[in-house]
Amino acid sequence: MLIQYHKISNNDPNRIQLLSMIFCEIILLIFELFEFAAIIFNMSRYQFHFNLKVVVGYAIFAYWFDIIARITIAFFEIGLFNLDDQTIAVETEKLPWNYKNMFFMLLFCCSTYRVYFMFLICSVTLLLAVERFLATIWVSTYESVQHKWVSIVLTSTNSIAGIFGSLLFHYELIFDTAVWCSLGLCFNFVSIFLYVILFNSNKSKIELCQTREITQSYTLSLRFQLNENLKIMNWIKNSILVVTCFNTLLAGFLIASNNEYLKNDYPVLVKCCHTFLNLGIAIYAQVVFFVAILADRHFRTYFLRFKPIRVFTKPFFGRIFPEDFKIKKILSTSDETNVYFSKLSLQWDEQIIRSSHVVVAKKKRFWRV
C-alpha cells in the first residue's frame, strides 16, 4: 500500500535537516490556513461568474482541508502521534472496513485525501478550461442564465473520480505511480491546448465584431462578454503555466518517494524526496496564489481592494507594486460633493478667463484694422 507517510527515525543520518524542513512546512501551512480561510470568507464578494467562482472555490476549499491532512501526517512523521511500523504492516494487509487501529485509520484517511488533492491540482486546470469553453459557446446567455449545473457536474465528477483514483493508487491497482503521474500531467497539457484554442477563438470573434457592421448577432453586450471572457482567460493562463511547471517537478518527487526499489536500497533518498514533495506543494500553493492575485494589473487592482488579500500580500510585494497597495482615502458624500463642485467652479473660472482673453485679443485686432 502506497501510504504518503515516511517516519523520521532517530537513526536517520539527515534527521535534523528533515525535521527542519518539516517544521518550516508546518509553519507555512499554518500561515496558509488563515490566509485561505480569509479568501474563502470573501469569495461571495468577488464579481466573477457563478461557475468560475464555484470551480475556484472548490479548489481552495480542497486545499484548505489538504493542509489539515498534511499537518496530521506530519505529526505522525515527527512522532507526535505514535504509530509503529508493525501496526502499519498488519493493518495494510486488511481491507478498509476491517481496520481496527484508530491512528492507522486517521493516517489512511489523510493519505487518501492527499492523493485525491494531487489528482485535483492536476485536473483543476482542465475544469477551468471546460468552464471557459462553455462560456465561449453560450456567451450570449452565460451571464443572464447562470447554467449552475455546469459547476455542479464538473466538481462532483472531479470529486468522485479523484477519490476513486486515490484508492486505486493506494492499493496499487490498474496502474503504477509513474502512469498515474503521467495521466495527471496529460490533463495539464490538454487544458493548455484547449486554452490556446479558446483564446484565439475569442480574439477572432472580437476582431470580427470590430471589422463588420454591428448586426443582431454582435450586440454591444455580446462584445462586452467576449472581451471579459478573453481577459479572464488571459489572467488564468498565467496560473495554468505555473501549475503545469510545478506539477511536472513534483511528479518526479512523487514517483521517487513511492518507488519500491528506492525504498529498499536508498531509504534516505526516498524520505528526502517525500519531504521535498510536501514542502514543494506548500510553496506551490503560495506561488499560485501570488501569481493569480498579482500577475495582471487589472485583476491586481481588483483583488487588492479586499483587506485580507492586501494584508497577506503587502509584506512580500508592497515595494514592488507601491501604487497598487496604497489605500485611497474614502471621502464622505458631502466632501465628495464639495470637491466635485470646487473642481467644476475652477474649470468654469478658467473657461471665463480664457474667453475674456479671446475677446480682448479680438478687440485689439479690430482697432488695429
Curated annotation (Swiss-Prot):
GO terms for molecular function: G protein-coupled receptor activity. Residues 42-55, 140-148, 200-234, 296-369 are cytoplasmic. One of its GO terms (cellular component) is plasma membrane. The chain crosses the membrane at residues 21-41, 56-76, 119-139, 149-169, 179-199, 235-255, 275-295. InterPro entries: 7TM_GPCR_serpentine_rcpt_Sre. It is found in: Cell membrane. It is a multi-pass membrane protein. The keyword Ligase does not apply. One of its GO terms (biological process) is sensory perception of chemical stimulus. Residues 1-20, 77-118, 170-178, 256-274 are extracellular. Keywords: Cell membrane, G-protein coupled receptor, Membrane, Receptor, Transducer, Transmembrane, Transmembrane helix. Belongs to the nematode receptor-like protein sre family. This is Serpentine receptor class epsilon-2. It comes from Caenorhabditis elegans. The lineage of its organism: Eukaryota, Metazoa, Ecdysozoa, Nematoda, Chromadorea.
